[in-house]
Structure formats: C-alpha cells, structure tokens
Amino acid sequence: MKLPLSRVAEFLSADGEFDRDAIATGYSIDSRTIRPGELFFAVKGEKMDGHDFVWQAIEKGAIAAVASREHISASDSLVILDAPGRGGRTRASAPTQSKSGLMVVEDTLQALQVLAKTVRRLWARPLIAVTGSAGKTTTKEAIAHVLSSRFRVHKSEGNFNNQFGLPLMLLKLEPEHDVAAVELGMSHLGEITALSQIAEPKVGVVTNVAPVHLEFFNSIAEIARAKYELIESLPDNGTAVLNGDDEYVSQFGREFKGKVVTYGLGMVCMVRAERVEALGEKGSAFDVVVGARRERATLPLVGNHNVHNSLAAVAVGMEHGLTLAEAVSALADLAPADKRGQVVRIGNITVINDCYNSNPKALAAMVDALMTIPAKRRIVVAGEMLELGPQGEEMHRESGGSTAEKGIDVLIGVRGLATWMVQAARDSGISAEFVASPEEAARWLSREARDGDVVLLKASRGVELEKALEIWQESAISHQPLAVRKSLLNDQRPKTKDH
C-alpha cells in the first residue's frame, strides 16, 4: 500500500530527517533487490544486520531508510555504517538530492510489524491464515485459486510466513484487493500468536499436526498446542476450518466460540471427499459432498494429501459465498506450487519434484502418491529430514523401512541422517544407496535412471535437493542435438500459476 512518509512516521512514532511529502511505493528489507521509491527497513537477521546496508539501499533509490536509534549519531541524520570500499567503521550521511534520509525508531523489526498491522487494519477486509505441519503453501495456493474465480485475491508469495515475510506481504495489500490469503509458520511456541496479532485473520485454516520442529518441541502434543494458537487468535465471529481427519486438529474447535467447518474423508467431516480415484501423475478425481449436495472434482495435483488441501479450499470458498459447484470447478486448473509435487520429464523418465521440504508424514504421503503412477521402477530420492531433534535417527529408520515396504524399487538417501533410511530400506530387502550430496544424487540418477522410471525427489529445505534435478537436467540436455536441447528446455519449465 502506497503511503506518504509523513503517515508512516506517524504510525511508527518515528523522527529523523526525510522528505515527509514523499510517497513510499513499496517496502523492503533487502538492499540487493530494493527498487527506487521503496522504503528500506534495516532489520537485523540471524546472519546480517540491515544497518550495514543502509547506504547501498539509499544509493539504489530507496526513498528513505528506517533505522534504529542506537545506530544513529547524536547530530544530523548520520548512520554508523560499514560503507563499501572505505574500510572500517565509517560515518556516512544519507544523500540529500532526493531528500532521502533516515526515519529513526527504537526497533526496526517492531516498526515493520507495526506498519504491516496498521496497513492490514486500513485495508479492513477478510483475511485467511493457514498453518499446519505440512501442506500450508499448497493449501494457501488452492484457497487463493478458488477465491480468484470471483474475487481479487492477494496472497503471500511462496512461504513468506515468518516475522519478516508476513509483514512484507501485508504491506502489499491494495484497495483493489477483496480478500487475502497468507500462511503462518513457526518453530517455537508463541510465534503463531505473534503473527496472528499482526495479520488479524477472520478465517483460520489448520491442515495437520506432524512430528516436525521436534528440535524445538518436546512432543507432538506441544506442536499441536502451537498450531492451536491460530484458532485462539480468531475473533468470536470468525471461522475455523479444520482437518477433521487429523487426531489433533479435529479437536481444535471444541472451545472455539465462532463457526467451525471440518473437512476430510471421514463421515463426520462437513466438507467431505468420497469415491476418490487416483489418476497417477494427472492427480485425482473425487466427489465433494456438503450436506445433501455433491459435485465431482478433478484435481491435477498428485497425492491423496492434496485432496485434503483442496477440500480446505472448497470450504473457504463456500464461506466466502461461492457455491459448491463454483468452488469445485475452480480446482480443475489448479497448478502445483514451486517444488511441491511438480511433475517434470527427463526424456522418458518422470520426475516428481517435491523437494521444498520434508518430514516423516509428508514423505509417506508422497510415496503413497508415487505408488499410484505406473512405472517400470519407482525410485525415491530422499534427503535427510531436519529439525527432528533427539528422535531424528529413529524417525529416519522408521521412514526408510516404511518407504521400502510400500513397494518401491530403489531408495537413495541424501546427506546426514538419511543414511539410517538407507540401512532400514536394505534391511527390508530393497536396493538402497547413500550419497553425501545433491550433486552425488544427480550423478547417480544420470547414470542409473532408465526409460519408464518414475523418480520422487523429497527432502528438507536445507538439503537443497533441487540441485540434483537441475544438474541431472543439464546433463541430459547436454548429450542431445541442439534442436532437441531447445525442445527439452521448453518442456522442462515447470507449469505453475500465479493469481
């Protein structure tokens, strides 16, 4: 939302020297990507401090920079910076030609969040927040897609779901948007409460609870408690949309004073899927049942877990006035989010790129999806699953054994704890091999994958398993004639959709 700096300063109780009549056309915390006219917030992250890059942001055209008082000198509007090429700590004043300057606050991250909350309140329209251990992004994308059949929807980009990303997404709200859909992530208790206080959702969607982030939690029950914070944060006239098939999430509506809508495959679910038919890499078809109404849905996303994600979208769509038929119809051209179940081809080999993140429950769901696709061989390339805490080794063993028992042909474990998956898979009698990196995985795939194979790539974000796919693709293309190379490059661009 565009705002004059005078109003921004008022909202943030900021002082300093800057052009109060100037209009901020956007907001950024990254000096590398900032565009002219945007307001730069010098926030401190885990590895970098934005105050070290104020000068670069202003040189790139930032209309002003929001800096904390401790970084500002007592006179004028000078910032203590590590100015590039000057060596050591240097005092550099902001450029004056465009009246760019410094907006001074006590805490820059808090200021970013306060401004985001203020913009959200000025916008004053319905906002849907999605959380859960798995499926947040796909569910959010599905909700935005369904709602876009009638409304102008603002959605968070990718997984901008933390204390930095969520405020930046809210600051992009514009008067023309009718509704917004965001996701809320967490790794500690209290984080979803804090994010909800910024976003102020009217509708809260919880997808599931699974053993993730156990490095920071003592039990799955504690994870459930953290996810429940979204429901606690909803207003009494809000709506909780809950996975009725999840043993934890299904209980979240018991004490909620607002409206509760459950979805899933169980007979007690209010938005229910019946007669589910797996269509392999083409997705699935199923009946969506709401009361006495029934509509047949076609969903071009692989895996039964995506049936659940799409049911949440149907439920939210109907809560916003769409008919069952309208909501179900919108699912037919839903495209997968980046690195989340994207189907690509390398020659006559089918690859399911689901390597954005992983946990035992999510891996099991994708292996189930893999088993619905006809193949000469089914190969699972599984990277280690991070943040599982003391139970990490045991969970990798269990995942390796259960993956093998589903009937796959080969398991390749990538990095770290994935070695325990490989050992368990071998103990179950299938071919399994451990590699130390995505690069080694790419070499194995280039050498061993054959026509007719279907390959699943699944790993935690930190493994960066997408590198294996990129290297494998490049290797396959480099061995083809020029005309074929151009064709393959076009074919392998993932088909995703934005709203």
Task: Locate the predicted segments by residue.
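Phosphate-binding loop of NTP-binding sites
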Residues: 89-91, 97, 104, 108-244, ...
